[in-house]
């Protein structure tokens, strides 16, 4: 019984995952469209909003070091990027985090 299910699942993946079904992508080196003086730090979480905009949680100019810093990051650490233009729609999170990581986006 298990062998039969394994064969069926294997056939399913073989049929569904052929090169014809794989979508290709094209790099847009103009996206995102951030201001010239903007510092995008280490991304610690990335999500997609209900309107398909990209939500980025990053560390700004903060670098990982030992001992851990005690000061909060001065830059906005959470960005909402427009899914079409790549421009910042909203940003917040300054003076909230020391060394952020992880992100969950809900409705």
What are these model-predicted stretches?
Residues 1-2:
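N-terminal secretory signal peptides that target proteins for export/translocation
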Residues 17-107:
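Sequence-structural signature of mature extracellular/luminal beta-sheet repeat domains
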Residues 5-14:
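Sec-dependent N-terminal signal peptides
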